[in-house]
Amino acid sequence: MTYHDSKTYTLILRDIERALPLKELLVRNNINVIIEPIYTIAPVKFKPINFKEYQALLITSVNTIKILAKNTSREEIQKIKTYCVGKVTEKYALKAGFNCVKTNATSGETLANEVIKKIKDNNKKILIVGAKNLAYNPIPKFKHAHISTKRIVVYKKIPNENLSQSCSTLLANEEVSNIVIYSPETATLFLRLLKNYETKNINAVCLGMKTKKILEINNWKKVQVVDNIELKTFANNIIKSNMT
């Protein structure tokens, strides 16, 4: 088997820092990569958090960790059991001093399942901290398990008005073979920026069925769904799609 034309690229729709590990893995497999952040992170004001009021903390992203670590003392965050979505997020949390509980979760949904198994049955709530829009909202699952929750928004995403020149050029020249999309929100924002570029030959590797549905509603022809956020899962799907 051979790879597609070496001039084609995989486009990762994510901030540069978070996208680099996947880029490095793909480059080692002779795949060209371009990273295209399509929004910026804007912290929002939130009231001081008394972590003693909660039995556990659920963190959805590295951005959440950075904001909490900046606005909360290390002593405070060490006292509450913390569950993170993904190993990369957990790595950042441990470095920042959070008291992370080890899990085998590979998605927001599987993490919610593990939290439900591990927490105690008491009157304290689960604190969910993250962005204004969550790729997966665990609150209904917790409610079904009779677990109370509190959600605090610490940042929002400001959409970019245009794609970068390099990204636009690759799309215009039909030199993008794969696009990596991590959330329904990212899919929606990207489709707004896509304009009249041809996508029929672009394979979208996306996280979750909600993201897939958004793409299919907008007539995206080639969509692969990844059910967890592990690097190797995304990389393997892209490598396979790049082979003929």
List each model region and its residues.
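Signature of uroporphyrinogen-III synthase
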Residues: 1-244
